[in-house]
Amino acid sequence: DRDGNISWTLAGRIPARSGHYDAQIPADWTQPDTGWHDWLDPGHYPVLHNPASQRLWSANSRTVSGDQLTLLGNGGFDLGARATQIRDSLLAREQFTVDNLQAIQLDYRAPLLTRWHQLLQTTLETADDAASWIPVMKTALAGWNEQAAADSVAYRIVRAYRYEVMKTVLSGFAAAVRQHHENFELPRLSQTESILWQLIEHQPQHLLPAAYKTWDELLYRCAQTIAAQLQQDGGITERNWGMQNAARIKHPLSQKLPGWISQWLDMPHDPLPGDHNMPRVQSPNFGASQRSVVAPGQEE
């Protein structure tokens, strides 16, 4: 406000829950002390007011903890990688210009993937295999600069490796459920990063997916899988991030019209820097709803 105070809270209604039941588990609301009984009084809303850091950030991640988090519940908040980068950039300065704040919004560094890059390098170095794709992938990984740049081959490889390992490990957990419910699908799980790393670092044999003898084999086979995918259409070193992350912004009518007309209605397929899990959120058909910098008293 005009006095320099800053605050964060929620807009809209929050349900007032009955009793102390766990809202993340299906429950029978006909039972006492279960379900919602009204709307929460705004006076009980979570509020962050003038934090010691003199900074506020959210980026769709968890903003509160403890009793306040219990009050809100888990609505599927983001991993927090994007919020961490924004926080660190805000704490790096005491004074900001418009350009400084815009640079934070356009930041496409990928520190989340740094240890995935290291893991993939280690996996390739220790592999007892003379496969031809290994030296090619090593060469491509040498260009790693921790950025989701459109021309980065290394970023595309490391990103694909992370998702392949994640898919493989989580599918192992789902397999046990599918033995009893064959159509079971895992929900969207945005907080799996720390769980994955605990498994990778401790390598518990009883949690290893049945198709693999060791965790090292799993990590190697995941690298082998993405190598096979990226070797198509020109080879690994030709498959940069911009080829995958190219704009796909279509006119509402173009999908129902012949291709020669659609090309005049759709936006160009420009290669895009950025990705999920970083401030510059940008994918072929999704991105930040808006990017703006406003100084109080200088709204124009």
What feature does the model see in each segment?
Residues 1-133, 139, 143-300:
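C-terminal/peripheral segments of proteins
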